[in-house]
């Protein structure tokens, strides 16, 4: 459940520090409380995230229609929250195991792997191309497929959990 509900809770907490939430202080007042250095580092990281999502082809070109790409700027706050939510939930899960024997694998998957499988299952969806196009243009949330694949690509612990070696498919 840490990979699912834990991530959702961490996601909502992270909104307090995303591209919008970062503009409010501890009392909820709009206030630039970040140092110039912190703001510059945040912008550099979020620019990378925007470019990563902008490069995602959500629908290929067909029948005279151009390909449709994700909109990294539109979905930035949610993508930041997905990144943060995963990290918060992973830390909470590991803290819950402190001083305890690690749970046994289930169906051949380690507890760490099951954490990420729980996350992927949370965002599983089956939608028509027309809805993919509509959501990509209007929704501040990335499509479920990309909430998983594009988010996990930035998390070294995911690669470690599944023993993914550096190679041509390594992101």
Place the predicted regions along the sequence by residue.
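Zinc-dependent metallohydrolase catalytic domains
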Residues: 1-6, 16-171
């Amino acid at each position: 459940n840490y990979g699912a509900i834990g991530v959702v809770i961490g996601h909502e907490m992270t909104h307090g520090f995303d591209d919008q939430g970062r503009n409010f202080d501890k009392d909820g007042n709009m206030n630039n409380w970040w140092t110039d250095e912190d703001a510059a580092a945040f912008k550099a990281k979020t620019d990378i995230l925007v470019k990563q999502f902008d490069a995602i082809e959500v629908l290929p070109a067909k029948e005279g229609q151009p390909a449709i790409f994700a909109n990294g700027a539109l979905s930035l706050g949610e993508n930041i929250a997905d990144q943060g939510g995963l990290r918060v939930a992973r830390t909470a899960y590991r803290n819950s195991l402190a001083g305890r024997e690690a749970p046994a694998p289930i169906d051949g998957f380690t507890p760490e792997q099951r954490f990420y499988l729980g996350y992927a299952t949370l965002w599983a969806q089956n939608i028509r191309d027309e809805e993919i196009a509509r959501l990509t243009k209007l929704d501040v949330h990335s499509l479920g497929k990309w909430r998983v694949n594009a988010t996990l690509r930035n998390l070294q612990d995911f690669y470690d959990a599944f023993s993914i070696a550096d190679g041509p498919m390594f992101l």
